């Protein structure tokens, strides 16, 4: 392996740089890698300054803004990649966390000798049938183009790349690792956050962390909570995150008369404190790759009631159950009502795959191996 005198730069490609799932995973690794050896730059497909931009710059990274790909702007989009890599062709690798356009920029990267990595974060596609069809065609080409393939779970890998790639030598699991020590339950933080939210000690606080969007299915959770509240008045529902369905979800809360019972925090940078404040974590997603928030909730000692659509690979301890959304609202109300409550202070869940300190070192070694 060549001796390193300056950090080698890896170009991270994402849809945007808000605090979403894929972005959180990337930033966790970024913080814990040795940035004297590996440094990240970012492509963001947004026309505004991103939420994470200042943080990235403070860590030594650079952010470049590209137009969002719309099919009709294919020539313009491809030209921007050609011009960009013509002037920035010293990257060790391009790590595509937004693989829908990877078939466009991977051949350009190879022209300049840049290694390419395709990374899957989900086990389902969104969008209309035309968009999904175009993405499938794009992914088909990526399967033959990329030098390496990663996914957050086996299920996401098979969905995005197919069995032949997942069972081949170029594929690996890139765990959605976190700082385990950060998510350990804190009685002090619990009291602080509950005081801030005006939640009393004897009130049950049900929590959910995730983008306010269709896949996360918070609308179903609100309807479940509405029915649950009839059996246990005084309970509260805490929704941490923002997203494109925020207004619609808030309208549902008002329609059901839950304005004083459902708490919206928006995006926060101290999720771990809010997890300590919760009593129970409920996650009724329609689909996921491997949700970081469920890993975090388990590490915080919360009992988790999770949709059966979520891969079982997310289980890192015994305090989680997987339930079918088709069982309906009453079934989920019953599961919440019968969820076990236990002391969280002495819980000590350890899982080396999800320990960011270990995972970041492995990622660093992988990137550096591309030098040989």
Language-model segments: which ranges?
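Short His-centered aromatic/hydrophobic patch
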Residues: 96-104, 120
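A short, active-site helix/loop in glycosyltransferases that binds the activated sugar's phosphate group
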Residues: 145-185
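A short helix/loop element that forms part of the nucleotide-sugar donor recognition site in Leloir-type
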Residues: 184-199
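Short hydrophobic beta-strand element within catalytic cores of glycosyltransferases
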Residues: 44, 294, 303-307, 312
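A conserved mid-protein helix/loop that constitutes part of the nucleotide-sugar donor-binding site
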Residues: 23-28, 204, 208-227, 244-250
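Aromatic "clamp/platform" in nucleotide-sugar-dependent glycosyltransferases that forms part
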Residues: 267, 286
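N-terminal strand-loop element at the rim of the active site
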Residues: 2-8, 12-20, 24-79, 170, ...
């Amino acid at each position: 392996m060549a001796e390193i005198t300056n950090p080698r730069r890896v170009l991270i490609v994402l849809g945007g740089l808000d605090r979403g799932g894929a972005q959180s995973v990337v930033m966790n690794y970024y913080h814990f890698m040795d940035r004297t050896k590996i440094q990240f730059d970012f492509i963001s497909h947004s026309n505004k300054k991103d939420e994470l931009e200042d943080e990235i710059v403070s860590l030594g990274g650079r952010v470049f803004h590209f137009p969002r790909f719309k099919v009709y702007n294919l020539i313009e989009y491809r030209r921007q990649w050609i011009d960009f890599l013509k002037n920035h062709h010293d990257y060790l690798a391009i790590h595509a966390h937004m693989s829908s356009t990877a078939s466009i920029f991977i051949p350009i990267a190879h022209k300049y000798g840049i290694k390419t990595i395709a990374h899957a974060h989900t086990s389902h596609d969104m969008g209309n049938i035309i968009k999904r069809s175009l993405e499938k065609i794009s992914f088909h080409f990526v399967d033959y183009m990329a030098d390496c393939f990663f996914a957050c779970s086996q299920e996401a890998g098979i969905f995005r790349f197919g069995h032949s790639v997942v069972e081949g030598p170029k594929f690996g699991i890139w765990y959605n690792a976190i700082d385990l020590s950060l998510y350990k339950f804190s009685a002090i933080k619990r009291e602080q956050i509950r005081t801030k939210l005006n939640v009393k000690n004897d009130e049950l606080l049900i929590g959910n962390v995730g983008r306010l969007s269709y896949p996360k299915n918070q609308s179903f959770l609100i309807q479940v909570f509405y029915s649950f509240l009839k059996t246990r008045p005084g309970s509260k529902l805490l929704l941490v995150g923002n997203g494109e369905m925020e207004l619609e979800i808030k309208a549902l809360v008002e329609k059901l008369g839950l304005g004083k019972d459902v708490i919206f925090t928006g995006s926060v940078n101290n999720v771990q404190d809010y997890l300590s404040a919760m009593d129970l974590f409920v996650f009724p997603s329609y689909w996921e790759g491997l949700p970081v928030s469920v890993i975090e909730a388990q590490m915080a000692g919360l009992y988790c009631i999770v949709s059966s659509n979520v891969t079982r690979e997310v289980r890192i301890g015994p305090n989680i159950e997987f339930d079918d959304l088709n069982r309906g609202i009453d079934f989920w109300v019953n599961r919440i009502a019968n969820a076990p409550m236990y002391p969280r202070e002495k819980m000590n869940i350890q899982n080396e795959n999800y320990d960011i300190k270990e995972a970041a070192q492995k990622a660093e070694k992988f990137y550096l191996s591309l030098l040989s």
